[in-house]
Structure formats: C-alpha cells, structure tokens
Regions:
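Glycosyltransferase catalytic domains, chiefly GT-A lineage
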Residues: 1-164
Length: 164
C-alpha cells in the first residue's frame, strides 16, 4: 500500500515540509510515497525546489493544492488572537476535499516532525470505525480548559492517520 502523506503549509513552512519529506523518503527507501501539500500560498521558487526534490527522489510523487480561496471562506475563531495561530492550520479540515477523491487514507504530518522509521505499519493501522488516529496530549485536560473546550478529548493534531 502506497503511503500518502499530507501537509498544510504556507511559504514560511514549505521548506520544513521538505525536510520531513526527505526523512520519509530516506527512511522508506524503495517505497513509493505520495506527498500532498495543501498550501496557503507558496512561491515559484518553492515550487521549483519541490520539482528538484521529485527529480532527486523519483519514488516520490508530489501534488500541490492552492487552498487560499477556500481558507478565505473560513471564519477565524472568536477569542483566539490572530497572532497566536496561523491560518494554514485550517488546511487540515480542507484536505478531504482537496486531495484526489480516489485516496482513501492520508497520513497528516506537521512540518516540524521527522520520520525516523518505516511508515508502512503505521499507515496500515486498522482504525476500525474511527475516522482518524492521533496521540492524546499528555496534559489534555489543561489544554482543553484553556481553550474553553468541553471535555478532555484533546489530541495532538501534528501526526494524524485519517480515513477519507
């Protein structure tokens, strides 16, 4: 099963996604990997570097999706100062509609992660009827309370296995 990895980035973070992509390819040598970058504006130079990556690592397939128009339609949450959150975090909720419809699963990774091993076992994990798998935050109750969330089902959204 080919691993499909998705990122939500803007021009400030696309270079870091490139580092994650490199770690994924090197740790999974010989495996075909699809990379899906849902972007809030990246430069032509960024696109050129991604094309260079594709030439260096021919087992990697790269798809770039411009999410700016869709992000413009999402109302910014009340009570959260704009300087505290980058709107590219909302690309996660757009991914199911932006990636190709034939994809049934993606592994979402934040641009500040690294791949330190094989992805196949994690990617093949049986989610049962759950829509996604993610790690619980260690201090979930405190974080949930801080943002005014009811309950304590707070998870780390930086690494998510998502069934589409």
């Amino acid at each position: 099963m080919r691993c499909e990895i998705a990122f939500g980035v803007d021009a400030n973070y696309v270079k870091y996604a490139g580092i994650v992509m490199t770690s994924a390819v090197l740790q999974n040598a010989g495996e075909a990997i699809g990379f899906h970058l849902v972007c809030d504006g990246i430069t032509e130079a960024d696109c050129d570097r991604l094309e260079d990556f594709r030439r260096i690592f021919p087992s990697a397939d790269i798809h770039i999706y411009d999410a700016r128009a869709r992000l413009d339609e999402i109302p910014f949450p009340k009570g959260i100062p704009r300087e505290r959150i980058n709107r590219s975090v909302f690309t996660r909720i757009l991914m199911p509609e932006m990636v190709p419809q034939e994809l049934t699963r993606i592994l979402y990774l934040d641009a500040d992660t690294l791949c330190v091993g094989q992805l196949s076992e994690m990617y093949a994990y049986d989610l049962g009827s759950a829509p996604l798998a993610a790690a619980r935050e260690g201090d979930a109750a405190r974080k949930a309370q801080r943002i005014g969330m009811r309950g304590t089902d707070y998870f780390n959204a930086g690494v998510m296995l998502i069934d589409l």
